Structure formats: C-alpha cells, structure tokens
Amino acid sequence: MNLILMGLPGAGKGTQAAKINEKYNIPHISTGDMFRLAIKEGTELGKKAKEFMDQGDLVPDEVTVGIVKERLAMDDCANGFLLDGFPRTTRQAEELQNLLSDLGKSIDYVIHVDVPEEKLVERLTGRRICPTCGTAYHVVYNPPKEEGICDKDGSQLIQRDDDQPETVKNRLAVNIEQTQPLLDFYQDKGYLVKVNGDRDINVVFQDIESILEKK
C-alpha cells in the first residue's frame, strides 16, 4: 500500500500517520527523516543536501527527488510506504510519478486530512508549552489542571511566537496557496480521498481504515 498523507498544520496529520504506521506496518517517511538518514549515511545526495541546508538554502528538487528515490527503494518499503511532507509542488508530484514508475510502484491513495481553517486557527493558537520540561497543553482540548501552570513542574506556560493568531493565519494562507495545486493534481489523477479531520482522532482513523480496506 503506497500512500501520501496531506493536511494543513494543525490538521492532525502526524497522529494519523502514526496510527497508519502501527496498524499497517508501512514506514512513515517524512522529508526531514529522509534528509537526516541520507546525511547520516553519507550518501552522495546526502552530502549535497547537507551543503544546501548548512547554508540555510532550500534543497533543490533534483536532490530531494533523488533522496526520495533512494529511500523508497529500501527493503522496508517493499510492501508499501506512507509519504509525509513530499511532494510539496506539482513539479515534485510529477517527478514522484516518474520515479515510482522506475521502481515498478504506483500511488494507491493520497489522503487529505481536511479541517476548516477557523478550526485550525483555534487548534494552533490554543497550544501552550512548558518552557522548562517541554510538555504541551491546549487551552481547550488538553488544559492543565491550573490555568497557565504546568502540571509537572509548576512553571508558567508560554505561547510560542509561531502560535500567535496573526502568525498562524499567515502560515495557513501560505500553506493553502501551496497545497491547492497539489490537491487539484491528485484529484485529476483519481488518487485523492478527503477525510473530515474535524472529529475525534479515532473516528478520523476509522474513516481512513475504511478507505484502505477497499484496497
């Protein structure tokens, strides 16, 4: 089963990826993990990626696609994979189609965990972090016992700059602009399935299971 998981920040994509990985035993492959592995193993492409990353530059498509191809050719992907964070553009999506064809593979589903923008803003702006131990809370979904205070060590909880309302709205706007052409691409190919992510995480996963059981 070869899957791509898509969703905006705060949609709960990471949670669903972990559940898919656990139930179906297919590797959850994120772009960051792929880069780290290639750099750690000292592959030619890993060295090239490191050069760009060390300079704070974006890694070019040809290097990224090469690293993806190396990763998908590994033994643990023989029975499937779950891609997360790649592709990010329609050009990368086209390159992925080509490299999968070279490997004798194809995509089964592109699962889009869809959550209304206002809900994403609520989820992201409600996050609070303990600066001492790193424990994460949410003012609505996972509040501390005492408002604004960490349950574990009594530290004053903080809101990260990234989670300020204006920053969150800007980040979502950029992501929506980048993601829509990709969703259209996979819709046209017949791979795209949308799952309503604005529900309990177990209910969302049941929907994903019902899609995957059809395969």
Curated annotation (Swiss-Prot):
Q: Does the keyword Nucleotide-binding apply?
A: yes
Q: Where does AMP bind?
A: T31, R36, D57, L58, V59, G85, F86, P87, R88, Q92, R160, R171
Let me see what the UniProt entry remarks about domains.
Answer: Consists of three domains, a large central CORE domain and two small peripheral domains, NMPbind and LID, which undergo movements during catalysis. The LID domain closes over the site of phosphoryl transfer upon ATP binding. Assembling and dissambling the active center during each catalytic cycle provides an effective means to prevent ATP hydrolysis. Some bacteria have evolved a zinc-coordinating structure that stabilizes the LID domain.
Location of region: LID: 126-163
Quote the EC number: 2.7.4.3
| One term under GO cellular component | cytoplasm
Indicate the quaternary assembly: Monomer.
Write down the species.
Answer: Oceanobacillus iheyensis (strain DSM 14371 / CIP 107618 / JCM 11309 / KCTC 3954 / HTE831)
Region (NMP), start-end ranges: 30-59
Where is the protein localized? Cytoplasm
Q: Does the keyword Transmembrane apply?
A: no
Q: What class of enzyme is it?
A: transferase
Q: Which family does it belong to?
A: Belongs to the adenylate kinase family.
Q: Alphabetically list the UniProt keywords.
A: ATP-binding, Cytoplasm, Kinase, Metal-binding, Nucleotide biosynthesis, Nucleotide-binding, Transferase, Zinc
What is the protein name given in its UniProt record? Adenylate kinase
**SUPFAM superfamilies, A to Z:** P-loop containing nucleoside triphosphate hydrolases
Pfam families in alphabetical order: ADK, ADK_lid
Q: What does this protein do?
A: Catalyzes the reversible transfer of the terminal phosphate group between ATP and AMP. Plays an important role in cellular energy homeostasis and in adenine nucleotide metabolism.
